[in-house]
């Protein structure tokens, strides 16, 4: 089972701090997943627009930081710690071409339930 969340709902551009407006939704999702078994893979994806900051030297670093933030948020006040596995893919697995009109679809978090 895969849940895909558009990054615009979760993060500001170039950042890995969760937007406060999405926090309650993520908490409800985490609580609902407590009743499941198996690992939960959280994968961060970006578009191919280059980023190079001291905090995020590449899209891979940004995507991993975002996946880690989602995992940390989901682990808070739940029994999911130890089942959550964050990973970053950067721009390596786009859903669509990275044209200006489509690239936003490539900026996402995927949550996979691995039974």
Regions found by a protein language model. Name each.
Residues 4, 10-20, 33, 45-115:
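Periplasmic OmpA-like peptidoglycan-binding domain that tethers envelope proteins to the cell wall
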Residues 23:
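P-loop NTPase nucleotide-binding module
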């Amino acid at each position: 089972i895969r849940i895909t969340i558009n990054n615009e709902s979760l993060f500001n551009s170039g950042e890995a701090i969760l937007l406060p407006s999405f926090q309650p939704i993520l908490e409800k999702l985490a609580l609902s997943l407590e009743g499941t078994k198996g690992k939960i893979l959280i994968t961060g994806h970006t578009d191919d627009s280059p980023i190079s900051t001291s905090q995020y030297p590449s899209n891979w670093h940004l995507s991993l930081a975002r996946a880690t933030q989602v995992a940390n948020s989901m682990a808070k006040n739940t029994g999911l710690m130890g089942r959550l596995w964050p990973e970053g893919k950067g721009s390596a697995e786009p859903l669509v071409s990275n044209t200006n009109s489509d690239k936003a679809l490539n900026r996402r978090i995927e949550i996979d339930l691995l039974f």
